Amino acid sequence: MSNNVDLLSPFPQELVRKAPAGKFGDYVPHAHYVERLRDSGVKYSWFCEPIYSTYNGEKRIVGAKGIITIHDGEHMGTYEGFGDIDTFKLSNAKFNDGSNLKDAESDAFKRACMRFGLGVELWSGSTQSEEEATAAARG
């Protein structure tokens, strides 16, 4: 697929944000993943559903499960991703289930994209594309 380079190239460093205090790993905001999918010319669909559990005796949204399907004229793949809610948000009235679901869905979306290879450098720590890594290995 000619769009693989456009789709799967590492995100430019200026889009990468530092992890908030107490969090692991730098990140790229959700909107940039959507822009990358849109601009690469692939078609995709996204489905997300909340995950419920009981917290302090109340039924609460504690996470999200998302499924992304990516096409390039042919079916390329379907990938799942999960996002969770920080426990402190469940105890804080400032954070409701709606805002918590939004955050969990964003994480689920980015994790599902990562399974395909989009943004994987943020998880692996590598900023080289496959082509660059192969060329470097050949010397």
Stretches with model-predicted labels:
Residues 2-3, 18, 130-139:
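Interfaces that engage single-stranded nucleic acids at replication/repair/recombination sites
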Residues 1-31:
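N-terminal, Lys/Arg- and Ser/Thr-rich interaction peptides
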Residues 31-137:
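Positively charged, aromatic-enriched nucleic acid-contacting surfaces
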